[in-house]
Amino acid sequence: MPQITVVNQSGEESSVEASEGRTLMEVIRDSGFDELLALCGGCCSCATCHVHIDPAFMDKLPEMSEDENDLLDSSDHRNEYSRLSCQIPVTGALEGIKVTIAQED
């Protein structure tokens, strides 16, 4: 199981184990981070699972879909490392990744 570091909106870091085959959204939400709302449950329709990805891991992620890109455009906190965590499957390649929960819009 890959270890990931989740940084909450206050800047506090926590290390959690992530089961492969799940999404980052599921792992973060199920690890007790209530500030990751994930209102749509992972259907890529709300952008409430917005995170900032460690730049060193951006090339290990699947390409961003047009739908994900459009949803992120609505965020005031979007940056070049923004992704929707519901669109990122956990794989062994994510071992050691740091994911920061974006501030709410």
From Swiss-Prot:
Taxonomic lineage is: Bacteria, Pseudomonadati, Pseudomonadota, Gammaproteobacteria, Lysobacterales
One Pfam family named in its UniProt record: Fer2
Which sites bind [2Fe-2S] cluster? 40, 46, 49, 86
Q: Which gene encodes it?
A: ddmB
Q: What is this protein called?
A: Dicamba O-demethylase, ferredoxin component
Q: Which residues form the 2Fe-2S ferredoxin-type domain?
A: 2-105
Q: How does it assemble?
A: Monomer. The dicamba O-demethylase multicomponent enzyme system is composed of an oxygenase component (DdmC) and an electron transfer component formed by a ferredoxin reductase (DdmA1) and a ferredoxin (DdmB). In vitro, dicamba O-demethylase assays in which DdmA2 is substituted for DdmA1 demonstrate that the two enzymes possess nearly identical activities.
UniProt keyword list: 2Fe-2S, Electron transport, Iron, Iron-sulfur, Metal-binding, Transport
Q: Name one GO biological process term.
A: P450-containing electron transport chain
Q: Which cofactors are required for activity? A: [2Fe-2S] cluster
Q: Which family, according to UniProt?
A: Belongs to the adrenodoxin/putidaredoxin family.
Q: What does this protein do?
A: Component of the dicamba O-demethylase multicomponent enzyme system involved in the degradation of the herbicide dicamba. In vitro, functions as an intermediate electron transfer protein.
InterPro entries from the xrefs? 2Fe-2S_ferredoxin-like_sf, 2Fe-2S_ferredoxin-type, Adrenodoxin-like, Beta-grasp_dom_sf
Name the CDD domains for this protein. fer2
Cofactor-binding details, from the entry: Binds 1 [2Fe-2S] cluster.
Q: Which domain of life is it from?
A: Bacteria
MF GO annotations? 2 iron, 2 sulfur cluster binding; electron transfer activity; metal ion binding
